[in-house]
């Protein structure tokens, strides 16, 4: 017979981390928010698609706002207070995700645009004809 003390799942102790980095990847189709510590270890993440939005509703600012709120809930267990925000991509969820993180109670220390810009690298795709 197994002892009942061994049956209980051990909950991992979460380290208290004060400063974090929020990476917001805003594409035309979806928004991905990842919050990590200063070393780059992921603390939590959320996406607009994973928040219950499908199809064209994934690419709305409201979906990005809900995803940022969900990510903030996950990360607040670690005690994160200050965030550096790194925004990547041209999507519609850029600003609303930053505003949602600010409204969630984080002190935003800096906002940086890290969108990759080619110095005439790859040939762009052909123009859409609708």
Curated annotation (Swiss-Prot):
One of its GO terms (molecular function) is structural constituent of ribosome. Transmembrane segments: none annotated. The keyword Ribosomal protein applies. InterPro entries: Ribosomal_uS11, Ribosomal_uS11_bac-type, Ribosomal_uS11_CS, Ribosomal_uS11_sf. GO terms for biological process: translation. One of its GO terms (cellular component) is ribosome. Keywords: Ribonucleoprotein, Ribosomal protein, RNA-binding, rRNA-binding. Gene3D superfamilies: Ribosomal protein S11. Pfam families: Ribosomal_S11. The keyword Amino-acid biosynthesis does not apply. Located on the platform of the 30S subunit, it bridges several disparate RNA helices of the 16S rRNA. Forms part of the Shine-Dalgarno cleft in the 70S ribosome. Belongs to the universal ribosomal protein uS11 family. NCBIfam families: PRK05309.1, uS11_bact. Part of the 30S ribosomal subunit. Interacts with proteins S7 and S18. Binds to IF-3. This is Small ribosomal subunit protein uS11. The lineage of its organism: Bacteria, Pseudomonadati, Pseudomonadota, Gammaproteobacteria, Enterobacterales.
